[in-house]
A protein has these predicted regions:
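Expand to "…catalyze enediolate/carbanion chemistry for C-C bond making/breaking, isomerization
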Residues: 2-534
Length: 534
């Protein structure tokens, strides 16, 4: 049981090791507010998670998603979302990262328009990380955040990025907090504490409580968030519509309901984002037993692959028809300081990616490293001199269900690609279990999505008749095990002694093998991994 100075609401228990900042995060009024939201909405969260499972059974039986006939009137109707607040009309470059103190300061200072402060995929949800993240964002909102490290001081500069925290997805619990004997929703926990402590302060400073919403699978899941927003604002006396949220379209099923998601959130919408890596993961996950579905090496599946191109263009068209921001996807590259040729090759990839997004009509884009902000900004400044390009309507874009489901390329699947999946999986899960969810791997800043693709591809290649390497060998459990053992031996020399000592790479490899060799597919690797951390 938590050693807390705060009286808990009836039915609530907190079972976690006390961390220094939690007494100012978990105040009595904040916890009461959290409990009220959880009691009001937890039954619906569970119903929606059950709907996900039922829908997966239909996909396993061969059904494919389609545009919903019952919501045709919404798709064909002439309506717009509520206008955007002044401070988020221009979002040309957004930086993403976890909520540790140094990252928050550097991200807010880096020249980006906004900072997606991540409680989700770039974060390992230890109790300490969740509590410190909330305290760090509260200090950032008030402009008081500072940090000292190795004789260097960090503090906020003059103009800072606008904050967009990302709470956890509907599938994740906050295991340290139970209400009436059951864990509370991780997403409601993250949202409620941030909103309670910061909404009025943000509004007083000319900004507002803005959020990114991950992993939605339907407009009904968007409706749940909208109802939470409406109740939260009413409870605290915050004007209705103050909350604005950008939904990451990062599941194949949500791509069929983009209009409906904007409609459900229209008082609270800040548009949609092209969540490319989780989107690929979702495609593999949803059609994992479909014998016709099998994607090539992860490196071959890019934003120019036909099904990815269709999804991105449909998102831009859908958003702009509703006067909503259409945000481009992540550039995960990290500047390579000791190899100018490799660095130039990486940066040229970033430039090509951002030029495509800007000319497609995106209103901004994501980067994972401050060093990429000037590159992305220069491109959007060139193609988008105005704050956004909502006016770029894209009447030329006509995307069908068939286009969204045209999953190519299927080849090549190579041993090198499989080894890369395994090595990335070992490194990411090993770091995550050590408390770090944002991990530099092979000059890319990776979050959970890349590890999800990696293990899902191998799981499917083992089971699909199309899971055959370019040299003719079938991918099997035995081949996977052989590669895993070999790659684990290489990990210490790749990550370095210091990182290897702080990570849990052997445990990570074991978990990677368990979930990949298992006959039943694990929906999210972070679910079993969460049980292994404090």
């Amino acid at each position: 049981m938590m050693d807390t100075k705060t009286a808990l609401p009836a039915g609530m228990q907190i079972d976690a090791k006390h961390v220094a900042v939690q007494d100012r995060v978990l105040t009595a009024p904040a916890i009461a507010f959290l409990a009220k939201l959880c009691r009001a909405f937890e039954p619906r969260r569970q119903q929606l998670l059950a709907l996900r499972a039922a829908r997966q059974k239909q996909f396993d039986g061969g059904m494919l998603p389609e545009f919903l006939p019952e919501t045709r009137a919404i798709r064909e109707g002439d309506w717009k979302i509520a206008p955007q607040p002044a401070d988020i009309l221009d979002r040309r470059v957004e930086i993403t990262g976890p909520t540790d103190r140094k990252m928050v300061i550097n991200a807010l200072n880096c020249g980006a328009s906004t900072f997606m402060a991540d409680f989700e995929d770039a974060n390992c949800p230890t109790w300490e990380n969740m509590m410190e993240g909330q305290a760090n964002l509260a200090d950032a909102v008030r402009g008081t955040i500072t940090f000292e490290q190795a004789g260097k001081s960090y503090k906020l500069g003059g103009k800072t990025a606008v904050l967009f925290p990302r709470p956890r997805g509907w599938h994740l619990d906050e295991k340290h907090v139970t209400l009436d004997g059951k864990p509370v929703s991780g997403g409601i926990f993250d949202f409620a504490l941030y909103f309670f402590h910061n909404a009025k302060e943000l509004l007083a400073r000319g900004s507002g409580p803005y959020f990114y919403l991950p992993k939605l699978e339907s407009h009904l899941e968007a409706r749940l968030w909208n109802d939470i927003f409406a109740m939260a604002q009413k409870e605290l006396g915050v004007p209705h519509g103050s909350i604005k949220a950008t939904v990451l379209i990062e599941t194949i099923v949500a791509a069929f309901e983009m209009d409906e998601i904007l409609w459900e959130l229209k008082d609270h919408s800040a548009g949609l984002n092209i969540g490319r890596w989780d989107y690929i993961f979702s495609c593999i996950k949803k059609f994992r037993v479909n014998r016709d579905f099998c994607l090539a090496d992860r490196s071959q599946v890019t934003m120019t692959s036909p099904f990815m191109r269709s999804y991105a263009l449909l998102l831009v068209k859908t958003c702009h028809r509703r006067n909503a921001p259409a945000m481009g996807g992540m550039a995960a590259q990290i500047p390579i300081k000791n190899d100018p040729a490799a660095n130039e090759a990486a940066m040229s990839k970033v430039r090509a990616d951002k030029e495509r997004e800007a000319t497609d009509g995106c209103d901004g884009t994501w980067v994972a490293h401050p060093g990429l902000v000037p590159i992305a900004k220069a491109i959007f400044d060139k193609y988008m001199p105005q704050p956004n390009q909502y006016g770029k309507q894209r009447p030329d874009v006509n995307v069908s269900a068939k286009d969204l489901l045209a999953f190519q390329p299927e080849a090549p699947i190579t041993e090198a690609g499989m080894r890369n999946n395994v090595q990335v999986g070992i490194q990411y899960i090993g770091s995550w279990l050590g408390g770090n969810g944002c991990v530099p791997i092979f000059n890319l800043m990776e979050d959970a999505a890349t590890a999800e693709i990696s293990r899902s591809q191998v799981w499917q290649w083992i089971r699909s008749p199309k899971g055959v390497l370019a040299d003719g060998r079938k991918v099997t459990r035995e081949l996977f095990h052989e590669i895993l053992v070999d790659e684990l031996k290489k990990t210490p020399s790749i990550v370095g002694a210091e990182a290897y000592a702080t990570g849990k790479y052997v445990q990570g490899a074991k978990l990677f093998e368990e979930i990949t060799a298992s006959d039943s597919y694990v929906e999210f690797l972070t679910l079993p991994a969460y049980q292994a951390i404090d």
